[in-house]
Amino acid sequence: MPVVNLRLYGAFREIERVAPDLVAAHARKQAALKAIKVLYRDAIVSAIAGVQKAWAQRRERACPWFQQAIRHLQQVDELFLAEADRLHDQFAETERPLSHPAVESVRGAILDRLSGCSALLIAGGHVGVLRNRMSFFGLDEALRQKPIIAWSGGAMVLAERILLYHDHTTHGVGLAEYLDRGFGLVPGVVFLPHAEQRLELSRPENVAILAARLAPLRPVALENGGGIDAHGQCFGRADAIRELTVDGHLAPYDPAHRTAGGDDAARS
């Protein structure tokens, strides 16, 4: 069966060539978002320090000080996402990119290629660029019309929110932060591909804090050799798909707790 490349990156390059004013407005929006992320990261540092201090003093999830610290951290996350929403909405209302003749033409060609496909494969790569290009061309609704097989960063964009995370960085321990909202095709979860490589999952406090922070969304670790189908059923390696719990453990992913989503499958 032939594979058709939707060529989203090349499509955006074409928009850069024929609609420089629109692309400049998009770049200004992205620059404003980057500036907000600087404030967001500064706020995260302080908020996470409070969470870790409360956990260290009383290693109980029910500790009211820990719960309050988690709520503060969640408020920081929500503030960032609200600011990101504001910038995206402002750009859409002011520039109306999907109504721009150049975007209509290029987007139409993308949708024509997609219409002839029996399924959509979404690979990984730079999840931020992937999410931005898909969003720029308004592929949200088109994603719901096809069976999807996605892995790594491709799986991340299908969830409600996209979390960047890495406990092992060149400058020490990294801090998890939201990149943006995902497309919400798989509700109720945040996907964490290659979590074993990127997170200190052997430390119960790390697992518990991240799970508490993301609640009520469920953090699901995706490892090589396994996946989740459209009905929430896991396949492949039994230990490849696990959920981080607020008790500090990794548990088998339980589809009974998952809200039904679209026809999609996520893999590491």
Predicted features, each with a name:
Residues 1, 5-77, 164, 168-268:
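C-terminal and late-domain segments of enzyme folds
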